[in-house]
Amino acid sequence: MAAQGRKNVHGKTGVRFKAAYTKQKHENKLRTLVTDLVIHERITVTSGMVKELKSLADHMITLGKRGDLHARRQAAAVLRNGEAVTKLFSELAPEYKDRNGGYTRAIKAGVRLGDNAQKVIVEFVK
């Protein structure tokens, strides 16, 4: 007979490691962060999302460098508004035409007052 209790991330019972929120909420938060990064070119986040955020932001720049209609539609599917898509293809992507990857950097920025969470500044490399 299976044990009763909360399921952890891997589907097993017991509270070993619980997900903070669902996969859909996680992806939506990531999309919002990458949209803000494209618009403002520099954002401050907690350390948990940095790796995925950098990966997705680098992929968006790669799509912008391609510049065709299919790449624009793929970027529009991820980014939250048309302003971000336009800025990605017209301003950001041309700056990196001679660079092969590594478009973002992460700089540790101390801890947040209140919950002591590690803050990280994510920005595009100029």
Stretches with model-predicted labels:
Residues I107-R112:
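Short, solvent-exposed loop/turn elements at beta->coil junctions and helix N-caps
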Residues M1-E95, N116-K126:
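Ribosome large-subunit tunnel/peptidyl-transferase-proximal elements
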